[in-house]
Swiss-Prot record:
Protein name: Probable RuBisCO transcriptional regulator
Entry superkingdom: Bacteria
Gene3D superfamilies xrefs: 3.40.190.290, Winged helix-like DNA-binding domain superfamily/Winged helix DNA-binding domain
GO molecular function, one term: DNA-binding transcription factor activity
Domain HTH lysR-type: residue ranges: 6-63
CDD domains: PBP2_CysL_like
Main function: Trans-acting transcriptional regulator of RuBisCO genes (rbcL and rbcS) expression.
UniProt DNA-binding residue ranges: 23-42
Length: 337
């Protein structure tokens, strides 16, 4: 066989159909017509002389041959992208793309600052930030879809041997209260006082929720006795709920700097209890590491990796920047997303 029986465009179409589950949605995602997608698949099947999809059901299902081609096709597309990016790097950071992955908290509150600093130094390098769950982010690194990532959760066990995993920083979780709550007048909250609070939490399967339960359990605090007022799916929603007086919550200190400065949330330590988790920097050591990724990891990341990076936020509470609404009005706030 002198010529390849497929093109890169056909591999992209095959991958899109597998991801989207239908020819129409695949066509929409690729900004082409559905007939064009169908024609390319027909040509591909004719060239290979084998069906790639089982068209009997409502969802486009890959045949065994389709799965095999997709497996190799994804590797081919990934290598093509690596090749293009390696050539771009020859321009000495005068172009190219840096793709950074992050779990929810780090992607929302930490990475934007880092990327801002990087863009100031290398304005010609495009930066993409992909924020997903810890598991999905780790797989994105393993598959070569992102250059590096900072995550705060548990890395899937099946990936620990294939990734370069570096302890990056400690993320401290703090108890936040509405500024008009009686406990805000206390220097510290006793363990037994936690059972008197109503809590706003992430769902029970979230990484942060599990860390909180584990640490408090080691401090002989039974979170099963907590009064859960509601479960929400984002840190921003939790902060807004606490600010509105609906309950208390545990959140990363990196997520509350703005609110502490503005005096719309209160942070009080728990006597004898510190809740911390490790943030991990992960690479794929078997993938080409771009000059942009090297510059980001060597020049930007160290500035945020100091052991006490959370303490700068906690000092805001110690400086009495939080104002009780009984004494002063709360300033207007806006959602920073």
């Amino acid at each position: 066989m002198s010529d390849l029986p497929f093109t890169l465009d056909q591999l992209r179409i095959l991958k899109a159909i597998a991801v989207e589950g239908s020819f129409k949605r695949a066509a929409d995602s690729l900004y082409v017509s559905q007939p064009a997608v169908s024609l390319q698949v027909q040509n591909l099947e004719r060239q290979l002389d084998v069906p790639l999809f089982d068209r009997g059901g409502r969802r486009a299902q890959l045949t065994e041959a389709g799965h095999l081609l997709l497996s190799y096709g994804e590797k081919i597309l990934s290598l093509c992208q690596e090749t293009c990016r390696a050539i771009e790097d020859l321009q000495n950071l005068q172009g190219g793309t840096l793709i950074v992955g992050a779990s929810q908290t780090t992607g929302t509150y930490l990475l934007p600052k880092m990327i801002g600093m990087f863009r100031q130094k290398y304005p010609d390098v495009a930066v993409q930030l992909h924020v997903h769950s810890t598991r999905r982010t780790a797989w994105s690194v393993a598959n070569g879809q992102v250059d590096l990532a900072i995550i705060g959760g548990e890395i899937p066990g099946e990936l620990t041997e294939s990734l370069e995993i570096i302890p990056y920083a400690e993320d401290e979780l703090a108890l936040i209260l509405p500024v008009f709550h009686p406990f805000t007048k206390l220097d510290t909250i006793q363990k037994e006082d936690l059972y008197k609070l109503q809590f706003i939490t992430l769902d029970s399967q979230s990484t942060i929720r599990k860390v909180i339960d584990q640490v408090l359990s080691r401090s002989e605090i039974d979170t099963r006795r907590f009064k859960i007022e509601m479960e929400l799916n984002s840190i921003e929603a939790i902060k807004n709920a606490v600010q509105s007086g609906l309950g208390a919550a545990f959140v990363s200190t990196s997520a509350i700097a703005k609110e502490l400065q503005m005096g719309v949330l209160h942070c009080t330590p728990i006597d004898g209890v510190v809740i911390k988790r490790t943030l991990w920097l992960i690479f794929n050591p078997n993938r080409y590491r771009s000059k942009a990724a090297e510059a980001f990891s060597q020049e930007i990341l160290p500035q945020f990796a100091t052991p006490d990076w959370n303490q700068d936020v906690l000092k805001l509470a110690q400086k009495k920047l939080v104002v009780n609404v009984l004494d002063a009005a709360i300033p207007n706030t806006s959602d920073d997303g």
